[in-house]
């Protein structure tokens, strides 16, 4: 991952926005931004690897910068944090070193340094769009949800892992037209997760095909940090027999492009 970031630094501003130190090991927090940053243009934040083990979010963010970002030069400012949780990425872990879930900790006084450093990076800027790239994996159900129940002393209730791509919109302002534009683009790349027999995905009622909502700010989710009018969290299913790692990365890229295209079409000039 780091060599790819270094190569991209020829085209984007490489920003070190913090450093984590865990058990004597240091992890630099890196982002890449439009160069120059034009204050007259709208801005989009793209984040990946909030859960470090969700590989396609990291790979998709980097692939977007490598293959598609040039098409948006002069139209939108981009700030991309491709791997918010590098310790988790290296160790294939959902949580950070302190057994904290970063994607429930995005508050200024929260316990996750991955989260607080990203908040400080984003805070000085105004964003029209924030898309946060995630996966739902079999290990969520088989490993991390049982571990969460054990950690918190609560019963573990088995669930179903959705087979396919879906989006988590903000319950307070879901912007369904925006979400549906992303779903339409992604379904050309990979399949969209169907609801279960109760009409739900991960226990939440669908509000449109492939779309559920969470109260992002209440849950301390990454997608809540900017207050942008257009936000979403992508979820790819990499363990599906119907999807390859390349498709998962391509789905993330398609989601980012569709999100940018929708917002730019709505906010010309």
Where are these regions (language model features)?
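Structured catalytic-domain cores with a bias toward divalent-metal coordination
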Residues: 1-269
